[in-house]
């Protein structure tokens, strides 16, 4: 399946496949689009389609939502037949001998992605700069949604946010919600564990500044790596290459450039163009690019926001993005997503990441058979892992190793089952997890980093974690009684009943 170049090709491909519906009646961007999308995304699979709202009140831009909101649509957007193909491609890429330590392997992983020659292609003439607004750019021109009744404002929810390490120039592309404060400023909700926040911390260290709530007159935007200016340039791309949109959402290792990774996914380099008012590059095929800067000394109260947990995340202080320019296509499509109680569109983006990273986890933990992060666990609350158990404490070893692996450190509950268990069958997992554990022996309780959005944590970003060893116990575990044999019908009788099934009249 060929890679898609931009959002327009995705719309055309989805419409051709019968997986997109155009809504031609007027709709409000205040709550109405959310309710429509929520019903569609949680409805029967045949009615769960991408939506293109052509007449959004207060704007002449059509709004695209739920484009990635099902496994088949996301696979189409990424140029694969199924999401499992992502993992298969990574497994082939990693079918080489890597060095021994965890840190060395992650560094080598970045090199492997570079070796596929998927680096960005620089262009000077870009669709995202058909219209350039630098005199009086205004966020009011965008049909930004208010999604839920108690949201603190309107939010941009599907951005690719480009930042740079001020020392090395290393790029990061992340996806963070952006609250519209006014026509020229946004709340930059990059959480403390994310790449954008790390670049902000590095900017503080590099410039010797400390954050505070209120900023003075906006300073000049830094010109590049090594520049002593006290702010960091930021570019925000809306739309563009679907592979890059996905890559921005994925928790990639620091050594992997999201733009290169997207190029590897799509089989050719992503086209990038120099921004007009800041020294960063943006994807040439984007619909809209917001150029500006974040002053690490400035904070403003951001939120609340109806989040993917199904609850409102609390209002907290976050950095502020200042707009210096808007560049866009002549007739742009505004892409957005709705987050809320799962399953929503973001669940499928997370599912793609799960499938993609299984072979990477196996590279470091060869005993892992499969992983499932079900919708009910909203990514970080529940991770189910099947393993080839070989020695006492093996399940605990896997739990602690996973908690030490990048953003998996935020996982609240890890359930480990035996290799023959289908981790995607929640009924089977629950049956085995409740039947195979002795709470005194098989539960591991500890404390560690938690997701910013975890409202039940002991304190913000830190709390308890639970590991459950739901594997069968036997001689390896020195149990006091014999482990019972599982009830299974004989193959002979199963084959007999299969042959005679029509005879029974059932």
Predicted regions and their residues:
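Extended, highly charged
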Residues: 1-208, 227-506
């Amino acid at each position: 399946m060929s890679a898609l170049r931009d959002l327009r090709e995705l719309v055309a491909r989805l419409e051709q496949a019968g997986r997109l519906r155009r809504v031609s009646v007027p709709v409000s961007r205040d709550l109405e689009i959310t309710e429509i999308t929520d019903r569609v995304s949680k409805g029967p699979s045949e009615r769960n389609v991408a939506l293109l709202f052509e007449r959004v009140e207060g704007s002449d831009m059509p709004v695209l939502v739920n484009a990635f909101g099902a496994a088949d649509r996301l696979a189409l957007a990424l140029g694969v037949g199924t999401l499992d193909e992502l993992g298969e491609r990574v497994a082939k890429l990693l079918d080489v001998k890597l060095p021994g330590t965890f840190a060395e392997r992650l560094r080598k992983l970045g090199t492997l992605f570079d070796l596929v020659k998927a680096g960005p292609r620089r262009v000077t003439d870009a669709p995202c700069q058909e219209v350039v607004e630098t005199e009086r750019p205004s966020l009011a021109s965008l049909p930004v949604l208010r999604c839920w009744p108690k949201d603190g404002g309107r939010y941009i929810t599907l951005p690719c946010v480009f930042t740079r390490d001020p020392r090395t120039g290393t790029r990061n592309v992340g996806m963070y919600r952006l609250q519209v404060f006014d026509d020229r400023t946004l709340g930059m909700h990059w959480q403390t564990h994310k790449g954008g926040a790390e670049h902000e911390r590095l900017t503080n260290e590099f410039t010797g500044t400390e954050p505070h709530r209120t900023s003075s007159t906006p300073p000049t935007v830094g010109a590049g790596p090594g520049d002593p200016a006290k702010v960091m340039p930021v570019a925000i791309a809306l739309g563009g290459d679907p592979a890059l949109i996905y890559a921005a959402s994925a928790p990639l290792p620091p050594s992997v450039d999201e733009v290169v990774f997207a190029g590897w996914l799509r089989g050719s380099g992503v086209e990038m163009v120099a921004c007009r008012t800041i020294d960063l590059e943006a994807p040439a095929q984007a619909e809209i690019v917001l150029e500006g800067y974040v002053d690490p000394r400035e904070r403003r109260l951001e939120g609340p926001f109806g989040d993917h947990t199904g609850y409102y995340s609390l209002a907290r202080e976050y950095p502020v993005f200042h707009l210096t320019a808007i560049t866009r296509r002549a007739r742009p499509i505004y892409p957005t997503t709705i987050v809320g109680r799962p399953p929503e569109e973001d669940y499928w983006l997370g599912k793609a990441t799960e499938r993609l990273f299984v072979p990477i986890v196996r590279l470091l933990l060869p005993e892992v058979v499969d992983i499932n992060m079900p919708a009910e666990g909203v990514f970080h609350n529940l991770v189910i892992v099947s393993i080839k158990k070989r020695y006492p404490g093996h399940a605990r070893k896997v739990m602690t190793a996973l908690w030490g692996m990048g953003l998996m450190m935020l996982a609240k509950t890890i359930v480990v089952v035996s290799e023959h268990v289908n981790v995607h069958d929640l009924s089977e997992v629950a049956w085995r997890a409740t039947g195979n554990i002795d709470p005194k022996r098989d539960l591991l309780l500890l404390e560690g980093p938690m997701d910013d959005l975890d409202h039940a944590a002991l304190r913000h970003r830190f709390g308890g974690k639970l590991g459950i060893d739901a594997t069968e116990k036997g001689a390896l575990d020195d149990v006091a009684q014999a482990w019972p044999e599982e009830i299974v019908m004989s193959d002979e009788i199963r084959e007999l009943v299969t042959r005679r099934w029509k005879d029974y009249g059932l």
